[in-house]
Amino acid sequence: MAGLSSSQIPDGEFTAVVYRLIRDSRYSEAVQLLSAELQRSPRSRAGLSLLAYCYYRLQEFELAAECYEQLSQMHPELEQYRLYQAQALYKACLYPEATRVAFLLDNPSFYSRVLRLQAAIKYSEGDLPGARSLVEQLLSGEAGEDSGGENDPDGLVNMGCLLYKEGHYEAACSKFFAALQASGYQPDVSYNLALACYSNRHYAPALKHIANIIERGIRQHPELGVGMTTEGIDVRSVGNTVVLHQTALVEAFNLKAAIEYQLRNFEAAQEALTDMPPRAEEELDPVTLHNQALMNMDAKPTEGFEKLQFLLQQNPFPPETFGNLLLLYCKYEYFDLAADVLAENAHLTYKFLTPYLYDFLDAMITCQTAPEEAFIKLDGLAGMLTEQLRRLTKQVQEARHNRDDEVVIKAVNEYDETLEKYIPVLMAQAKIYWNLENYQMVEKIFRKSVEFCNDHDVWKLNVAHVLFMQENKYKEAIGFYEPIVKKNYDNILSVSAIVLANLCVSYIMTSQNEEAEELMRKIEKEEEQLSYGDPDKKIYHLCIVNLVIGTLYCAKGNYDFGISRVIKSLEPYHKKLGTDTWYYAKRCFLSLLENMSKHTIMLRDSVIQECVQFLEHCEIFGRSIPAVIEQPLEEERMHTGKNTVTYESRQLKALIYEIIGWNM
């Protein structure tokens, strides 16, 4: 029946055909037929009513509202059309318009439904006192017999939502749980319960409720293709159907992704997004689009920025979008763009940025032009947060003394949240001096924060880095690098390659060569095991360790050994040559060439020959490897032919020939 026009339908069959299409959820085709029919009979009540229904089911709420508005004008005595119009406007997030239409309804039989709608509008607008007042009216029975009572499932859900928005997550959980017990399994209520658990940092029960939603969704609706995309199966979009909405699968997978991301299980987070029922990109909801942008930012930053910028133009957009876009601009050092977005969207600043986040972003933007002023701003923010941390530490101690477990849990959660705000402020302060290569001052900043941060992995890692960079504190650096590596020793490739490399160098510089060799054997063994499962996978850990060690020897003037180590580290080239590894290798070669041109070193012909052969291999294997990763929002892109390892290796080879006077 695809593409069927009204002229092809036999006389007397039109209504039956339309109802069959609606029965089969083929709303788009029904819309085509009804729209054509209404051009001939624009005042057909039945046609407009069915068209409005189809638009509503297709989630084209503004179009549905327009149809219901026409119907209410044609039939003012039928107030249900005005109610439907208000509901469609609410669904379209046109809250002032929905409120205006709802106020026109004075039929007592619609009173409780209007109250529910008005409460939902106020809740969506963020007017929680107004929403609570209307919900309490409903619960008290003032709205008539069908308004429910205190133990009515709808009432419990409404109260749960209000408690959630007010930050009372434990109480919200109780309401949602009671609603499920009263009504039986409801996907949307189960999702609400999972969300409240997540917000209360109870990740295990949240994941349990999510797993239940997913399991039931798969069992009851196998046609939704859950997990197909992750498995690499090419499937068509399932669309934004009512069935998909009713299963709460999209919401569940998004929440699962958020939890895994919070737990730093980034692969699992990405998998949760690809596991959800397949839809075309233009069909994605704002939350999924936002999460895709965030979780693929490292691999596809340009795409991520485009998605977040697009979302900011939509109404509504996830409330985190504004802050996340600004933070990412600062992370990628697009401070001018961050300043422009803040200036152009002052109305969003007060709505979506906390005072802490605004002050932090303001300091970060100031860093670009006035680092001293930025440091003072960050210091003020750090002082405020350290006061809060001390107060919360005292609260925890007092609560433990009084054996008040509930207060302990609440204070510990608040402490953790405050610490997560403090760490970025501290790191931003440290980065100002790091950029000036004033490592002693960076160390001093970190030492001031030891009271709160000594157990925090990010703090420990950065302390290790600053000790390492001072070149006379390798032993102290080992004390910070070692616990990080040992914590992940059974999965050593999950540790950053530069951490492993710096630890190896620190061992070598403190004459602990056996420890360095043992660590390198461990890395090599894990890389070999990984290669058995996926022979074509590029793994750079051991390569980068060897490159950093080679760089160390080059820096000490031992180019014979250093360059040889660098060259051997990149074998086999098809598995070890990449943008990052080339970066380390070319630095050593540039240093070598600089010293050769100054005649401060002399290399044996055999070493020079080895260098030339190495660069020729890089020329062969580096054709499709970018020499540098370009910034995602650069307007002027590098020439694609020049931004390759092949091009740069030819340049280096030409420089070698020029310096040593060989004929090419």
UniProtKB/Swiss-Prot annotation:
Recorded GO CC terms: axonemal microtubule; intraciliary transport particle B
Coiled-coil region(s): 507-534
Keyword Transmembrane: no
Name of one Pfam family that matches: TPR_16
Location within or outside the cell: Cell projection, Cilium
Record-linked Gene3D superfamilies: Tetratricopeptide repeat domain
Keywords per UniProt: Cell projection, Cilium, Cilium biogenesis/degradation, Coiled coil, Repeat, TPR repeat
Repeat in keyword set: yes
Main location: other
SUPFAM superfamilies: TPR-like (SSF48452)
InterPro entries: TPR-like_helical_dom_sf, TPR_rpt, TT30
GO molecular function, one term: intraciliary transport particle B binding
BP GO terms, sorted: intraciliary transport
Extent of the TPR repeats: 11-44, 45-78, 153-186, 188-220, 395-423, 424-456, 458-491, 543-576
Disulphide bond pairs: none
The protein's assembly and partners: Interacts wit the IFT B complex component IFT52.
Family, similarity comment: Belongs to the TTC30/dfy-1/fleer family.
Function noted in UniProt: Required for polyglutamylation of axonemal tubulin. Plays a role in anterograde intraflagellar transport (IFT), the process by which cilia precursors are transported from the base of the cilium to the site of their incorporation at the tip.
Protein name per its UniProtKB record: Intraflagellar transport protein 70A2
Species, as recorded: Rattus norvegicus
Lineage: Eukaryota, Metazoa, Chordata, Craniata, Vertebrata
